[in-house]
Amino acid sequence: MVELMVVIFIIGIASAAVVMTVRSPDRGVRDEAERFAARVAALRDNAIVQSRSMAVTIRPSGYGFERRDNGAWVPLSEAPFTSTDWQRGTSVQMSGARQMRVAFDSTGMPSSAANIIIKHDNVAVTLALAATGDVRVVR
């Protein structure tokens, strides 16, 4: 009887270890969307702190950040605002547009609300940018 209990205990421990290591199929795209959302929110906050317009440009290949300087958009190169490519196999949809720029003014308000769909391995998540500047990832 004790041997049977020991075997059941070992099987339970082994199955718990397997469950803890299995990743959800949507975890990769969700992680990428969360990273992107955090960087967009940081850009919005930076626009407020620096009291200047800043923008994120989203392309099929990735995204980059810019600041308004003397009437022109200038790419940012300091972390965390470096240009970033999407993971291999990731695609984005932006309201039918091929490329999109969303600018934040000095109060943190975006130039437009946007829903950006990020897809990878047949799993999609949406980054919702509200007219108030709120940035969140929704399923």
Question: Model segments located where?
Answer:
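N-terminal signal-anchor/signal peptide hydrophobic helix marking the start
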Residues: 1-9
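N-terminal helix-rich module
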Residues: 13-139
